[in-house]
Amino acid sequence: MSKKTTKDVRNLSDSEMSDKIQNLRKELFDLRFKQATRQLAKTHRFKEARTELAQLLTVSNERSRSNTSS
């Protein structure tokens, strides 16, 4: 999976963004479960998924704040 930039994230629609947020939260849950059962091979996915989730949540919060202040 290629690294997304903030510019790519800002181009997503609200529905796409919420879908990606939901998918990343599920992926993080699965990664934690695999790590606990010692089946996880790609530990770098934790950092990548958390970073991507943080970017999505930041842009989502920016949008919601700009909608309420306008």
From Swiss-Prot:
Disulfide bonds: none
Record-linked Gene3D superfamilies: 1.10.287.310
UniProt keywords, alphabetically: Ribonucleoprotein, Ribosomal protein
Keyword flag Cell membrane: no
Cross-referenced InterPro entries: Ribosomal_protein_uL29 (IPR050063), Ribosomal_uL29 (IPR001854), Ribosomal_uL29_sf (IPR036049)
Single GO cellular component term: cytosolic large ribosomal subunit
GO molecular function, one term: structural constituent of ribosome
Matches recorded under Pfam families: Ribosomal_L29
Any GO BP annotation: translation
Family that this chain belongs to: Belongs to the universal ribosomal protein uL29 family.
Protein's recorded name: Large ribosomal subunit protein uL29
Species whose genome carries this gene: Prochlorococcus marinus (strain NATL1A)
Underlying gene: rpmC
